[in-house]
Amino acid sequence: VGSEMCIRDRRGEQPDVPCRPAARRVLVVTGSQKKETAAQVRRLEAVCGLHKVLLDSERLLHEPAPEEISRAAQRLTELLRQEDGAILAFDSLFYSQTGFADDDVAARKVGKSLAAKLGEVLGRIDHTLYDGLILVGGDTAVAVCRSLQTTQLLLLEEVQSGTPAGLLADGPLRGIPVVTKSGAFGDEDTLLHAWKYIRREGE
């Protein structure tokens, strides 16, 4: 998920860690602008009844907008107190893309800038309100882990090919389950599979 994180890959081994806990409240965080992610989020909403909190990406790109960060954090707090989880994303995920190529320097700069805002939102939420994370996008994963004072991810297995899962290996939330994926990866049900996996539904 990025050079700033230490990834300990134990997939295929028998790591000396506690049994993976079943998450009860899951926070899905995506900084992706990919149409694949938009379809996956809509599917997750429809099947699981989750609600999403959307950040105003245009505003956050041009001004600090601390009230926008506070608004999102407050709404997420309300949802996590009442429901099984919530989704944090940018409004721009659901309308036409900017047209930047994946390797465009401007696109990468925008992506990192917006991902940092996601970390700011999580930094204002009581971390006891959730016990599982699904992170979409490499910049998102780095920003979220930084905000949670986590420097290591312990990868244990894959939900499906290309969707690694594991635990936060250090920091205040050490031991909580996490699933990561790239924004463009997967089919419509990929996030739904991740949701069921992290909650251990059907096991």
Task: Write out the residue ranges for each language-model feature.
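Fold-independent oxyanion-binding glycine-rich loops
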Residues: 3, 30-33, 90-92, 136-138, ...
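A glycine- and small-aliphatic-rich helix-loop capping segment at beta-alpha/alpha-beta transitions
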Residues: 8-10, 148-158, 196-200
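Redox- and metal-dependent alpha/beta enzyme cores, enriched for Fe-S-associated oxidoreductases
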Residues: 17-114
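Catalytic cores of soluble, metal-dependent hydrolases
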Residues: 73-77, 99-155
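Extended hydrophobic packing segments that form well-structured cores
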Residues: 189-203
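Short, small-residue-biased leader/transition segments that mark boundaries at the very start
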Residues: 1-7
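Conserved, well-ordered active-site substructure
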Residues: 130, 135-190
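Solvent-exposed alpha-helices and their adjacent loops that cap or buttress functional pockets
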Residues: 17-22, 79-81, 125-127, 158, ...
